[in-house]
């Protein structure tokens, strides 16, 4: 087994690993009394700029330009209008970049550069931070930089005043991945006194490293099993189900490994869960809880726990503000945020229907199923069904293209979401009659 190829096969893993020593250095410098708060902001910002240029090359401009514009917007707009205008600018910019990917993939039929994929991934994370910051300002939780037009301060003072916001948008531990950190938590971590700054827990980092090693070994074993089988276009019945489940497991193992690596980088820099939570600070939200994701029999719980910080961001940004069809609007926006590929649109809309069905099915079961043997059987069956439906959705989203989506829809695997869809129709009709 080529271990070097195993751990650095994905470019994001390579660049996240390359940033690790600098995260440890930042943590060490913060313990020193001579490392001022302004120096911390500059270190994080400079590290983000260097990492962006190293990972994205000339495409890094697609990150720097919206970050600069976002800081300008939050500096000069009033709190009442800052979120709306910032949101539409950021999503418009991201959509244009995704349309460039569509043009290259579907019209030209050429594979886009790897650096462009990394840029789009980082741009999606930047959108999270920009909209989170603008929401905080709009809700009065965070103060915007002083208004340049109304203030008589010099231009350099305005730049220093905007430094925390600019550093937040581009700080290197979260540039390429990681749980969404609010501006308030980011500011509290950076401004924490040297005596209160958390020391590096090498035991926690070692444990995360062992988890990544185990996940990567599982990926190698599963990849060999998947590659030896048939494809979705020529599989038959149970073989199609096994192929879908094992391929989805490959995707999940990749996500788990990346999320743990991202969490390790944030921890090494002092922004992880081990940093604790002081008065007025927001808690750290990890993206992955493997045990909950793999043992739950509820599709709705899986949706809330999968990429948890993003799920909370979508809930705050879309779900709570939607007056009609909040669930559908949330998943539709998620498809827009991911790039509006055919498989993504179908996958996320299917997911919203499955979550709605999940609520009705489990509400009905809690009333009708009383004995514990039947409850145990029900839980086992719904767990298996949940895992297979999630695998179906994952293949649709990750396949992206229309041809891959057609292969998936024409396979026997479509039986599982169709079954939940029929139950949704029957239970919704029963609920309407009772009302």
UniProtKB/Swiss-Prot annotation:
<feature type="topological domain" description="Lumenal">
    <location>
        <begin position="398"/>
        <end position="407"/>
    </location>
</feature>
<feature type="transmembrane region" description="Helical">
    <location>
        <begin position="325"/>
        <end position="338"/>
    </location>
</feature>
<feature type="transmembrane region" description="Helical">
    <location>
        <begin position="121"/>
        <end position="136"/>
    </location>
</feature>
<dbReference type="Pfam" id="PF03062">
    <property type="entry name" value="MBOAT"/>
</dbReference>
<keyword id="KW-1133">Transmembrane helix</keyword>
<protein>
    <recommendedName>
        <fullName>Membrane-bound ghrelin O-acyltransferase MBOAT4</fullName>
        <ecNumber>2.3.1.-</ecNumber>
    </recommendedName>
</protein>
<dbReference type="GO" id="GO:0043543">
    <property type="term" value="P:protein acylation"/>
</dbReference>
<keyword id="KW-0808">Transferase</keyword>
<feature type="topological domain" description="Lumenal">
    <location>
        <begin position="57"/>
        <end position="59"/>
    </location>
</feature>
<dbReference type="GO" id="GO:0051366">
    <property type="term" value="P:protein decanoylation"/>
</dbReference>
<comment type="subunit">
    <text>Monomer.</text>
</comment>
<dbReference type="InterPro" id="IPR049941">
    <property type="entry name" value="LPLAT_7/PORCN-like"/>
</dbReference>
<feature type="topological domain" description="Lumenal">
    <location>
        <begin position="102"/>
        <end position="120"/>
    </location>
</feature>
<feature type="transmembrane region" description="Helical">
    <location>
        <begin position="41"/>
        <end position="56"/>
    </location>
</feature>
<feature type="transmembrane region" description="Helical">
    <location>
        <begin position="207"/>
        <end position="227"/>
    </location>
</feature>
<dbReference type="GO" id="GO:0016747">
    <property type="term" value="F:acyltransferase activity, transferring groups other than amino-acyl groups"/>
</dbReference>
<feature type="topological domain" description="Cytoplasmic">
    <location>
        <begin position="27"/>
        <end position="40"/>
    </location>
</feature>
<feature type="topological domain" description="Lumenal">
    <location>
        <begin position="228"/>
        <end position="240"/>
    </location>
</feature>
<comment type="function">
    <text>Catalyzes ghrelin acylation at 'Ser-3' using preferentially octanoyl-CoA, hexanoyl-CoA and decanoyl-CoA as acyl-CoA donors leading to ghrelin activity. In vitro also uses acyl-CoA donors of different lengths from short-chain (C2) to long-chain fatty acids (C16) knowing that acyl-CoA donors from butanoyl-CoA (C4) to dodecanoyl-CoA (C12) are more efficient compared to longer acyl-CoA donors, such as myristoyl-CoA (C14) and palmitoyl-CoA (C16) that are not efficient.</text>
</comment>
<feature type="topological domain" description="Cytoplasmic">
    <location>
        <begin position="262"/>
        <end position="324"/>
    </location>
</feature>
<feature type="transmembrane region" description="Helical">
    <location>
        <begin position="341"/>
        <end position="357"/>
    </location>
</feature>
<keyword id="KW-0256">Endoplasmic reticulum</keyword>
<feature type="transmembrane region" description="Helical">
    <location>
        <begin position="377"/>
        <end position="397"/>
    </location>
</feature>
<keyword id="KW-0472">Membrane</keyword>
<feature type="transmembrane region" description="Helical">
    <location>
        <begin position="408"/>
        <end position="428"/>
    </location>
</feature>
<feature type="transmembrane region" description="Helical">
    <location>
        <begin position="241"/>
        <end position="261"/>
    </location>
</feature>
<feature type="transmembrane region" description="Helical">
    <location>
        <begin position="60"/>
        <end position="76"/>
    </location>
</feature>
<feature type="site" description="Cleavage">
    <location>
        <begin position="55"/>
        <end position="56"/>
    </location>
</feature>
<feature type="topological domain" description="Lumenal">
    <location>
        <begin position="1"/>
        <end position="5"/>
    </location>
</feature>
<keyword id="KW-0012">Acyltransferase</keyword>
<feature type="topological domain" description="Cytoplasmic">
    <location>
        <begin position="137"/>
        <end position="206"/>
    </location>
</feature>
<dbReference type="GO" id="GO:0005789">
    <property type="term" value="C:endoplasmic reticulum membrane"/>
</dbReference>
<feature type="active site">
    <location>
        <position position="338"/>
    </location>
</feature>
<feature type="topological domain" description="Cytoplasmic">
    <location>
        <begin position="358"/>
        <end position="376"/>
    </location>
</feature>
<comment type="similarity">
    <text>Belongs to the membrane-bound acyltransferase family.</text>
</comment>
<keyword id="KW-0812">Transmembrane</keyword>
<feature type="active site">
    <location>
        <position position="307"/>
    </location>
</feature>
<feature type="transmembrane region" description="Helical">
    <location>
        <begin position="6"/>
        <end position="26"/>
    </location>
</feature>
<dbReference type="GO" id="GO:0018191">
    <property type="term" value="P:peptidyl-serine octanoylation"/>
</dbReference>
<dbReference type="GO" id="GO:0016412">
    <property type="term" value="F:serine O-acyltransferase activity"/>
</dbReference>
<dbReference type="InterPro" id="IPR004299">
    <property type="entry name" value="MBOAT_fam"/>
</dbReference>
<feature type="topological domain" description="Lumenal">
    <location>
        <begin position="339"/>
        <end position="340"/>
    </location>
</feature>
């Amino acid at each position: 087994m080529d271990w070097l190829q195993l751990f650095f096969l994905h470019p994001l893993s390579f660049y996240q690993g390359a940033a690790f020593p600098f995260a440890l250095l930042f943590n060490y410098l913060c313990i020193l009394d001579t490392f001022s708060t302004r120096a911390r902001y500059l270190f994080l910002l400079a590290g983000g700029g260097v990492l962006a240029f190293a990972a994205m090359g000339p495409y890094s401009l697609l990150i720097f330009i919206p970050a600069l514009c976002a800081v300008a917007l939050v500096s000069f707009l009033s709190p009442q209008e800052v979120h709306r205008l910032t949101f539409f600018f950021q999503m418009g910019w991201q959509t244009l970049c995704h349309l460039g990917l569509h043009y290259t993939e579907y019209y030209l039929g050429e594979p886009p550069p790897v650096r462009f994929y990394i840029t789009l991934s980082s741009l999606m994370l930047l959108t999270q931070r920009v909209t989170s910051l603008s929401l905080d300002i709009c809700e009065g939780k965070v103060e915007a930089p002083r208004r340049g037009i109304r203030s008589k301060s010099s231009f350099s003072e305005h730049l220093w005043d905007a430094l925390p916001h600019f550093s937040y948008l581009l700080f290197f531990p979260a540039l390429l991945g990681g749980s969404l950190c609010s501006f308030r938590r980011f500011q509290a971590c950076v401004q924490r006194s040297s005596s209160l700054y958390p020391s590096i827990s090498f035991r926690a980092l070692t444990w995360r490293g062992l988890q990544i090693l185990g996940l990567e070994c599982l990926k190698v074993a599963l990849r060999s099993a998947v590659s030896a089988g048939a494809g979705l276009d020529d599989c038959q019945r149970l073989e199609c189900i096994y192929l879908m489940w094992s391929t989805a497991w490959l995707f999940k193992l990749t996500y788990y490994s990346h999320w743990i690596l991202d969490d390790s980088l944030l921890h090494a820099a002092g922004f992880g869960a081990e940093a604790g939570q002081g008065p007025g600070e927001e808690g750290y939200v990890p993206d992955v809880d493997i045990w909950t994701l793999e043992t739950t029999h509820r599709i709705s719980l899986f949706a809330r726990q999968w990429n948890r910080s993003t799920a909370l961001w979508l809930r705050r940004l879309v779900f709570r503000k939607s007056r009609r069809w909040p669930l559908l609007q949330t998943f539709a926006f998620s498809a827009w945020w991911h790039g509006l590929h055919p498989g993504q649109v179908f996958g996320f809309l299917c997911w919203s229907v499955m979550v709605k069905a999940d609520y009705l099915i489990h509400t009905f079961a809690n009333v009708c199923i009383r004995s514990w043997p039947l409850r145990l059987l029900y839980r086992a069956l719904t767990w298996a069904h949940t895992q297979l439906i999630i695998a179906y959705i994952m293949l649709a989203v990750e396949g992206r293209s229309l041809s891959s989506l057609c292969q998936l829809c024409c396979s026997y695997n479509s039986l599982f979401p169709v079954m939940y869809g029929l139950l949704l129709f029957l239970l919704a009709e029963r609920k309407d009659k009772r009302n």
